[in-house]
Amino acid sequence: MISLTKGEGFGRPLLEFSLVNKPIIASAWSGQIDFLDRELSILVGGELKPLHKSSVQEEVLVEGSSWFFPYDNHAMAAMKEVQKNYDKYRVNAKKLGYKNRTNFSFEKMKEALGEILTNHVPVFPKQIELMLPKLNLPKLEKID
């Protein structure tokens, strides 16, 4: 898979693709860096540049944001390298697939979310039943 994105977010398509044990060439920027390491995938260098004013979209792409621009020559060299040494990159891809299946399984993600909630969500007080004393008020008579 080749993904030269300017800003992927978490990069779920890349994570899912890593599970099929095929080589990945991707931008060395954004959320995919959490699970695509330099030893087992090919990360293409580049630079952050401010978002062009014509790309600004209210509440989506805000002024002052930056995009990652991969270097074309790095991307071309990466593609040639994988083609030339495909067997080596296929072995690395299998290792990456195993690593990501282990570290990003449903159980691991559930455990990580549990830790985040435990560490950052306050313990809310439980509602208790009020035990008020009975008031012995005089009985009122109805007036016609």
Task: Put a short name on every predicted segment.
Residues 53-144:
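C-terminal amphipathic helix plus adjacent low-complexity
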Residues 4-6:
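Aromatic "clamp/platform" in nucleotide-sugar-dependent glycosyltransferases that forms part
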Residues 9-11, 28, 105:
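Active-site helix-initiating loop/hinge in glycosyltransferases
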Residues 15-23, 30-34:
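Short alpha-helical segment that forms part of, or immediately flanks, the ligand-binding pocket
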